[in-house]
Amino acid sequence: MNRIRIALVASLLASGFLAAHEEPFGYVRGAQTEPPGEWEVTQWTTARMGKESGHYLGMDFNTEIELGITRRLQMAAYLNTRYHHLRDVEGSEEVFEDRNRFGLDGGSVEIKYQLLSPDNDAFGLSLYFEPGYHSIRGISGQSGSSIEFETILILQKNFFAGRLVTAFNFVVEPELEREDGDWETELEMAWTAGASWRLTPHWRIGAEARLGTAFPHSRLNSAEYLAFFLGPALHYQRNSFFGTLTVFPQIAGWPDAQGTGGLHLDETERLEIRLKLGIEF
């Protein structure tokens, strides 16, 4: 009987350890870091669909190579490409030019440092910093230079030996964008949260939410828009391979086409779908 109890405890501890470095979300970042010397390659594919009228499809392709440096520090590099297909598109207020284009969109570098571990401490806490350069406008698909400095405060709390994973991110992203030869500033902010439940040893199901806004010229008293997304997330992991699918419809936004509340379809879309496929070495 004691042997059975020991085996059950060992199994629970092992399952928690194996799940310690999972990222079961498509949009929400976890507080885990890769073990020293471990590599991970992830392909991110995000489809953004639907404006007020017309045909709109934006595709973001991000190839990530990640490396654990120390027990608390990891770094990564991203190579980004984008595809846009726009025809007769109107947003809440903006009219977009027709476009059918695929192109290289620059890259970025990630630095993530873990202050508290979600497995060994009361909760997980990490700081994330990602400077990057873009050569294609994310919404319109036009050529244009921008430099971003994404900074994230990451909180994570695990329950039931890691069977339930919850996480919260506060995102601050200053941006420099070149317009007609001059550099203009913008500040984006987002609050994201997620919960993921382990159904089987390999499958997780959960939900993610994001509230995003932006402040032109970094003036905090003049928000450009608000957009709230909420949707399900499905995660699969077996050995060193994993995949995550998040379906993210916009639930509410401001201003809409009437200038009130509804869906904001200038800086955001009706629906986002993100697929992450990765393998660890």
Residues covered by each model-derived region:
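Bacterial N-terminal signal peptides that target proteins for export
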Residues: 1-7
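Bacterial N-terminal signal peptides
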Residues: 7-16
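Transmembrane beta-barrel domains of Gram-negative outer membranes and organellar outer membranes
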Residues: 20-280
